[in-house]
């Protein structure tokens, strides 16, 4: 099979109904919109308007707070780092944030990169990142490597 031979399954995309094309079509004249009124005209309804009743979004109390300067980290799991090391896309000798971005493992750094412990990790690697979970640090040291966190390095 070639790309130009690909076809939708029969009935996968039903024929579009052409509205307002005469009485014989079954969807002529009003085109299924009924008679007059706001809904028959273009623009349809006003979202969130409940006919004068206090709308839901006003009935419920305001709650919570969004921190305007909250740090957003790019998250990477150890299992994925291991895959990239096995594939030869990452050098286990020294893994930095820049090398993670260059390898395509992380799209962009954001406010830093945080390593989490999901997945198997067996490589003896030296990793330097902005943040890491305790279990990730343990997993790397158990494999014989070292995971340094930028905040700890700055404190020393």
Swiss-Prot record:
Keywords annotated in UniProt: Ribonucleoprotein, Ribosomal protein, RNA-binding, rRNA-binding
Gene3D superfamilies, per database record: 3.100.10.10
Entry GO terms, CC: large ribosomal subunit
Keyword Ribosomal protein listed: yes
InterPro entries xrefs: Ribosomal_uL15, Ribosomal_uL15/eL18, Ribosomal_uL15/eL18_sf, Ribosomal_uL15_bac-type
Pfam families: Ribosomal_L27A
Comp. bias intervals (Gly residues): 21-35
GO biological process: translation
Region named Disordered: 1-44
Subunit structure, interactors included: Part of the 50S ribosomal subunit.
Family: Belongs to the universal ribosomal protein uL15 family.
HAMAP family referenced in this protein's UniProt entry, alphabetically: Ribosomal_uL15 (MF_01341)
Protein name from the UniProt record: Large ribosomal subunit protein uL15
Source species of the chain: Ruegeria sp. (strain TM1040) (Silicibacter sp.)
Gene: rplO
């Amino acid at each position: 099979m070639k790309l130009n031979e690909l076809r939708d399954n029969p009935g996968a995309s039903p024929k579009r109904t052409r509205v307002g094309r005469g009485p014989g079509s079954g969807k002529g004249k009003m085109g299924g919109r009924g008679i007059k009124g706001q809904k028959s005209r273009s623009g349809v309804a006003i979202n969130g308007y409940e006919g004068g009743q206090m709308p839901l979004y006003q009935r419920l109390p305001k709650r919570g707070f969004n921190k305007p300067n909250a740090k957003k980290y790019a998250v990477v799991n150890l299992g994925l780092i291991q895959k990239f090391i096995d594939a030869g896309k990452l050098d286990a000798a020294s893994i930095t944030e820049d090398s993670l971005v260059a390898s395509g493992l992380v799209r962009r750094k954001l406010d830093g990169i945080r390593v989490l412990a999901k997945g198997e990790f067996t490589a003896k690697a030296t990793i330097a990142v902005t943040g890491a979970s305790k279990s990730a640090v343990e997993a790397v040291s158990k494999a014989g490597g070292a995971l340094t966190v930028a905040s700890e390095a700055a404190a020393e």
